[in-house]
């Protein structure tokens, strides 16, 4: 059996996912694509999925008889409408982050999915499938460092586009830490503060960069997350967790060590594509496998998308107020209690 996938949005990550569905993963086939830029959609189909039909819009693609599952990789503000339409059609949907740009939008998706009665949505929080983060999770579960006390994270990008704004440091970038850290710590967020250090000369006038986000969990763990999207030297993701009995850190991505011209060192990756390539493969294979087995979606859920959105809203409020803001979430519905399975491969 094959899961026939329709892809909405054929930009950077849409193309990447189409390529992996067609060339790397098993049990899937891209049968449909669409993009508001129809020339791009045609070009991408022609390059990576010659058999795919190019549709004029998301609604036509979702309705297509040869589309079993939908992959949403359009711009964030377009996600909610596509996910809701896919749910209405009773089709599985993998949605890149953010699930929706507002907490209310995420809640509408949660409600639609619960009304449908089966989990169909997986959110593209790929770090939960990254071997390094899985090793951290395992170490915490085995209590190798005892109770976690403090976390230090770094999320650096080489440079940001002109369209990247100060709030996007939260909604577009920190959102990955927001998701992965509460999953790692098995804890909930309580408060947040955002500090603005001296601004880099490499950021455009409208952008505050870097930023320091201080999150406190209900158990009292303090997380210090640096977001620096014009760091210039590379794509750098770090995470260190200090516990009562020791410290664990995210492993470096293995790379050849080169000694040449009087220097010794390794290449620094330049973007998310290579850093999380294996994680994207595993998350999407999990989505396809759930479809092949006709089982409820088991990856990061619509509820996880909602938690991330509520937390991001509080972070943006803290950016604006300069004060500590609280993060309040309703109780997780029973429908989502047994979600977000951890893949076994570490
Ligand atoms: N999980 C991850 O690490 C990453 C996730 N993303 C997420 O993936 C999404 C796409 O990001 P990129 O590929 O970098 O952006 P992009 O700008 O390269 O591509 C987005 C594409 O969506 C199309 N589009 C916009 N609205 C549309 C609509 N209503 N219907 C159909 N097509 C539409 C655009 O024309 C564009 O071609 C974003 O939500 C982003 O946050 C992006 C990069 C990495
Ligand atoms: O999701 C991603 C991008 O959309 C975002 O713009 C980057 O800052 C992140 O590093 C990347 O993982």
From Swiss-Prot:
EC number: 1.1.1.18, 1.1.1.369
UniProt record, GO biological process: inositol catabolic process
InterPro entries (UniProt xref): Gfo-Idh-MocA_inositol_DH, Gfo/Idh/MocA-like_OxRdtase_C, Gfo/Idh/MocA-like_OxRdtase_N, MI/DCI_dehydrogenase, NAD(P)-bd_dom_sf
Catalysis: reaction(s): myo-inositol + NAD(+) = scyllo-inosose + NADH + H(+); 1D-chiro-inositol + NAD(+) = scyllo-inosine + NADH + H(+)
Region described as Disordered: 322-346
MF GO annotations: inositol 2-dehydrogenase (NAD+) activity; nucleotide binding
Entry annotated with the keyword RNA-binding: no
Composition-biased stretches (Basic and acidic residues): 322-331
The entry's keywords: NAD, Oxidoreductase
Pathway it works in: Polyol metabolism; myo-inositol degradation into acetyl-CoA; acetyl-CoA from myo-inositol: step 1/7
Family: Belongs to the Gfo/Idh/MocA family.
Biological role stated in the UniProt entry: Involved in the oxidation of myo-inositol (MI) and D-chiro-inositol (DCI) to 2-keto-myo-inositol (2KMI or 2-inosose) and 1-keto-D-chiro-inositol (1KDCI), respectively.
Subunit (UniProt): Homotetramer.
HAMAP family reported for this sequence: IolG
Name of the protein in its database record: Inositol 2-dehydrogenase/D-chiro-inositol 3-dehydrogenase
Organism name: Shouchella clausii (strain KSM-K16)
């Amino acid at each position: 059996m094959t899961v026939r996938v329709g892809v909405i949005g054929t930009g950077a990550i849409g193309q990447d996912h189409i390529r992996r569905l067609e060339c790397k993963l098993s049990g899937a086939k891209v049968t449909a694509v669409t993009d508001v830029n129809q020339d791009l959609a045609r070009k991408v189909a022609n390059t990576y999925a010659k058999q795919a039909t190019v549709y004029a819009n998301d609604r036509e693609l979702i309705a297509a008889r040869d589309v079993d599952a939908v992959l949403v990789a359009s711009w964030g503000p377009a996600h909610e409408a596509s996910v809701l339409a896919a749910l209405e059609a009773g089709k599985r949907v993998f949605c890149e982050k953010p699930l929706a740009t507002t907490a209310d939008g995420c809640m509408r998706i949660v409600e639609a999915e619960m009304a449908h009665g089966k989990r169909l949505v997986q959110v593209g929080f790929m770090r939960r499938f990254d071997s390094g983060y899985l090793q951290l999770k395992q170490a915490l579960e085995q209590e190798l460092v005892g109770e976690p006390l403090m976390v230090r994270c770094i999320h650096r990008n080489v440079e940001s586009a002109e369209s990247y704004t100060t709030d996007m440091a939260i909604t577009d970038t920190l959102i990955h830490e927001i998701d992965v850290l509460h999953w790692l710590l098995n804890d909930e967020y309580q408060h947040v503060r955002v500090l603005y250090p001296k601004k880099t000369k490499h950021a455009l006038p409208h952008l505050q960069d870097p930023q320091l986000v201080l999150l406190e969990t209900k158990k009292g763990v303090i997380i210090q997350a640096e977001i620096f999207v014009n760091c210039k030297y590379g794509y750098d993701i770090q995470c260190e967790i200090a516990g009562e009995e020791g410290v664990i850190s995210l492993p470096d991505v293995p790379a050849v060590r080169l000694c040449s011209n009087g220097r010794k060192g390794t290449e620094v990756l330049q973007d998310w594509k290579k850093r999380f390539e294996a994680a994207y493969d595993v998350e999407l294979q999990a989505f396809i496998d759930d479809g092949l087995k006709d089982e409820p979606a088991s990856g990061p859920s619509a509820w996880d998308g909602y938690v991330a959105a509520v937390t991001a809203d509080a972070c943006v409020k803290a950016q604006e107020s300069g004060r500590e803001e609280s993060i309040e979430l309703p109780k997780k519905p029973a429908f989502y209690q047994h979600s977000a399975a951890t893949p076994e491969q570490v």
